[in-house]
Regions:
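Conserved Rossmann-fold NAD(P)-dependent oxidoreductase catalytic core, especially the SDR/UDP-sugar
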Residues: 66-102
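SDR active-site strand-loop-helix element
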Residues: 6, 42-43, 79-85, 124-126
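NAD(P)-dependent short-chain dehydrogenase/reductase
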Residues: 104, 116-166, 172
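NAD(P)H-binding glycine-rich loop region in Rossmannoid oxidoreductase-like domains
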Residues: 21-62
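Rossmann-fold cofactor-recognition segment
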Residues: 8-25
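N-terminal Rossmann NAD(P)H-binding glycine-rich loop of SDR-like oxidoreductase domains
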Residues: 1
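Glycine-rich NAD(P)-binding loop of the Rossmann-fold in SDR/ketoreductase-type enzymes
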Residues: 22, 52, 56-67, 101, ...
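Conserved catalytic-core motifs of eukaryotic protein kinase domains, centered on the activation segment
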Residues: 49-55, 90-93, 134
Length: 175
């Protein structure tokens, strides 16, 4: 596969475009002219940061996935959008895909509003664990690796996430 990244800075790992997601005109042009098979949206504002930055979370978590779907609607380009299992609060359990998304935090609600539900595009709803390019990242693996001594955590908890490697394989199959 030919893979191109989109980030604020060009990547040292893959060919990429440096641009801000708020520059929707440039992004629309890049996607339209690129004639891509798939656009994978991994942009998002996570948990606590979303709670402190409602406007940013609303744009990136809620509006932006629908912007991508709109840009690609008259093309063969499919959008694969990353959501989260946090759209469900977990209070009831045994959720199905079509259940009401009862997450209660701003993060949960902003991610729920961003989910794409149509015949063309795909929303992957999960949590992930894996290496983080940012040494100060808030991911589960980074958190675990920075702990010293006894680690506080949960008991009798079920986690439905997958590794970043498995997520990449899932995305490849979905594309």
């Amino acid at each position: 596969h030919d893979v191109y990244g989109f980030d604020l800075r060009e990547s040292q790992y893959i060919d990429s475009f440096a641009c801000n997601a708020f520059d929707t005109d440039t992004l629309r042009k890049v996607i339209t002219e690129g004639n891509y098979d798939t656009v994978i949206n991994c942009i998002g504002v996570l948990n606590q940061f979303a709670e402190q930055n409602h406007a940013l979370a609303s744009f990136l978590n809620s509006y932006f996935p629908h912007f991508l779907a709109d840009v690609t609607k008259d093309s063969n380009t499919q959008v694969i959008h990353m959501s989260t299992d946090c759209v469900f609060s977990g209070k009831r359990g045994s959720y199905t895909e079509s259940d009401f998304q009862d997450g209660e935090t701003f993060y949960d609600r902003s991610k729920a509003l961003g989910e794409l539900n149509d015949e063309k595009n795909i929303t992957l709803r999960n949590s992930i664990v894996g290496p983080d390019i940012n040494p100060k990242g808030i991911g589960l693996l980074n958190w675990f690796l920075h702990q010293e001594g006894e680690i506080n955590g949960y008991t009798k908890a079920m986690w439905t996430g997958q590794t970043t490697l498995q997520l990449a394989k899932t995305m490849e199959q979905a594309a």
